[in-house]
Amino acid sequence: GASEHQTGLGLDVYVKNFAGEGFVKSPAGQFVNSESWKYGFIIRYPSYGKSSTGIKFEPWHIRYVGKPHAAIIYNDRLTLEKYIDSFETGEWYSAEGYLISRQEIGESVTMPKAFGSAVISPDNTGCYMITVRNRKSAKRKQGGFLCCVE
C-alpha cells in the first residue's frame, strides 16, 4: 500500500488511558504536540487543518518531514498540504538555514551553485522537494516565511 503508515513516514503514538484526542492530555502527548517539530516531525492532522487535509484533529498521528520543513510548518501553523502548495515549482527558497525547492519529477533537477549535499524526496504530488544546507546567508522575505533565491 501507499498510506503514510505503510511507507514508514507516518506513525501513531499511543499512551495507555489517553486514546484519541485525549492523547494531548498526557505528558507524552503534550511533548509530542509542542516539541516533535524540533526532531523533524509534524502533527499530520492538526486542530486547525481539517479544511485542507479533510481529516479531523489527530494529535497522535505524526509524520517525518525533516527538521527545516517541520520548523516552518510548526512555526507558521501550516498543514503539509498548505506547505507544499506554498512553493512555486522550480524556484529556490531560503529558510531555517536551508535552500528548499519543489521541482517537477523528470530526468534532471536544478541545483544551486556550490552545495555540499542534498536531500531529494518525492512529495506525493508528482514533484520532488529538494533540501540543501544554505552556505550563503540569504535574506528572508519580510512578512513571509520564505524568499526566492536568485
Give the ranges of each region predicted by the language model.
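Short, surface-exposed glycine/acidic/tryptophan-bearing loops
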Residues: 1-10
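Structural recognition of the beta-strand scaffold that forms the well-ordered cores
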Residues: 10-15, 42-45, 63
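Short, flexible loop/turn elements at secondary-structure junctions
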Residues: 15-17, 66, 134
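Long, well-ordered alpha-helical scaffolding segments within enzyme catalytic domains
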Residues: 20-43, 47
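A short pocket-lining beta-strand/turn micro-motif at the edge of beta-sheets
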Residues: 39-41, 58-60, 69, 126-128
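Acidic helix/loop microenvironments that form the catalytic cleft of cell-wall polysaccharide enzymes
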Residues: 47-68
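Low-complexity, Gly/Ser/Thr/Pro-rich intrinsically disordered linker/tail segments
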Residues: 68-141, 145-150
